[in-house]
Regions:
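Metal-coordinating catalytic core of metallo-dependent amide/deamination hydrolases
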Residues: 1-54, 58, 62, 93-100, ...
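His/Asp/Glu-enriched, well-ordered alpha-helical/loop segment
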Residues: 38-47, 55-78, 82-83, 88-92, ...
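Extracellular/periplasmic ectodomains of large secreted or surface enzymes and adhesion receptors
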Residues: 247-248
Length: 248
């Protein structure tokens, strides 16, 4: 629906703090977007759309809501990719509409170094709003945005749990109110991620009858300090119960 924060092309309701003449851009014609989404939904295709700025997210949620009302109830699992900057009033709408927030926690500790310069101290409070979304009963799932960001889910969990920016200037976490627990981050990368792609019956948890895809880590993530998560390494990887990687 829009661009990115760093390029000032993410679409916001209010202008950028450092560029008061600019509020970003919507990259899609909204009427066309609704038509495309509605047609795809009628073919039972799952819809996932990029939205970063608060205007873009609001516009996409409005479009999703219109399509849901027009096409009737069913198990859609519409997704918003990024859901990065949200209007406070839109946070509860994800759960109300059964829309999944698909987010990339690494970006929080990267953008956190400079985001406030671009959008000011108020709007950052609902930037990468992991905890607010979970508290509103949203299905939150995590990914990497690779190759734009590192692919490692371990580093992503570190980012979600600590929110310590890459410049080490926020030891208590950038917007610490939005930090989540390790268990919540694990669910976002596993169980809920599988649900978000209609794969919960075959993966996401280790259960009889599901794919035996798993890793063995150097440390128990639940037994170490959150600051040490980023140092954890993969000792072995299994796909379908067969070892496909071993760290020698």
């Amino acid at each position: 629906v829009d661009g990115s924060l760093g390029s000032h092309s993410a679409a916001f309701k209010e202008p950028y703090s450092d560029k008061p003449e600019d509020s970003g851009i919507l990259t899609a014609n909204i009427d066309s977007l609704k038509t495309w989404i509605s047609k795809a939904d009628n073919y039972n295709l799952q819809i996932t759309v990029h939205a970063i700025g608060d205007k873009a997210n609001n516009t996409l949620l409005n479009t999703y809501e219109n399509v849901i009302r027009s096409n009737g109830d069913k198990d859609r699992r519409f997704r918003v990719e990024h859901a990065q900057h949200l209007d406070q009033n839109d946070i509860s709408r994800f759960s109300d509409l059964n829309v999944i927030a698909s987010m990339q926690p690494y970006h929080a500790i990267d953008d956190g170094r400079w985001a406030e310069d671009l959008i000011g101290p108020e709007r950052i409070n609902t930037t990468y709003a992991f905890k607010s979304l979970i508290d509103a009963n949203t299905t939150l799932v995590f990914g990497s945005d690779w190759p734009v960001a590192p692919a490692s889910p371990i580093f992503g969990m570190y980012a979600a749990v600590t929110r310590q920016t890459l410049d080490s200037k926020n030891p208590g976490g950038w917007v610490p109110e939005q930090k989540i627990s390790l268990e919540q981050a694990l669910y976002a990368y596993t169980k809920d991620a599988a649900y978000s792609s209609f794969d919960e019956n075959i993966k996401g948890t280790l259960e009889v009858g599901k794919l035996a895809d798993f890793v063995i880590l150097s440390d128990d993530l639940t037994m170490i300090e959150s600051e040490d998560i980023k140092e954890v390494t993969v000792l072995a990887t299994y796909i379908g119960g067969e070892k496909v990687y071993e760290n020698n």
